[in-house]
């Protein structure tokens, strides 16, 4: 047999390729069996073992959050037991414990899964996550208490951030931040009512603080009545009562009130001891004609967060470009960036 014939026979004896490149299928199958490293840039969730996941010790929600109550966890646990976790949680790699993960958001689903005796949970891995992201997530779900929001803002202020920066970071108004900052340093009677859960409305607490600054004893006595409901309506009535009382104390007394020192009524004291000759000597002053081009009392009406308000002109603002405002509907007083305020009208009071 010639050399050419032998070469042709050897070529025929070789395994034939399909032409589709499937002869490397074994290697491809091996690649498919390999797990991606932490799915760092993966598009979908993966099942992670629950025993490799830890809750973030710095998460904004605290242990006494209503969503963490045993009853609440049992409720979500029952649904997970029956239907599983339909919305994956978000985690990030734990920098202090390689191979483990910290929860970005989804702590209730995590606890509910443990309650239901699950061993894994669907999760997205997102390493680009910070505390502000956690706050935003929970704010959008209305899952943070006012105290938790205030504590977060306090931590951000301690880092040197300004209220306006924090407001922009979490997608809220500067007034929202200012209201919650008030919760960090409450007068004792108001702090007791707030911490006990009697007053949860941030607006109500801010209104009480404003009233307390002018009438601490009266507000403390009002709060001492445990049966007193803390609502916007009740606090508005309290402030109106205190304002009326203060106006009477400032001189609008009954003219027949007897002065304890002189023994005379206000009307008698007002007559004085001067005779008619004194009046003639002093002469009568003609009332000065009012200037029609000047306002006796200016009222500047504005709009803030789509709510009617007015500028408080006799209170010093905290900084340039800021001012004190008062909402027309509930009387709440607060600081606001003038960049968020729309001028509506200038009236005479």
Curated annotation (Swiss-Prot):
Underlying gene: korB
SMART domains with a match to the protein in the record: ParB (SM00470)
Function of the protein: In conjunction with KorA, inhibits the transcription of the kilA, trfA and korAB operons. Is also involved in the negative control of the kilB operon.
Gene3D superfamilies: 3.90.1530.30, 6.10.250.140, KorB DNA-binding domain, KorB, C-terminal domain
Gene Ontology biological process: chromosome segregation; negative regulation of DNA-templated transcription
Gene Ontology terms, MF aspect: DNA binding
Protein name per Swiss-Prot or TrEMBL: Transcriptional repressor protein KorB
Superkingdom as given in the UniProt entry: Bacteria
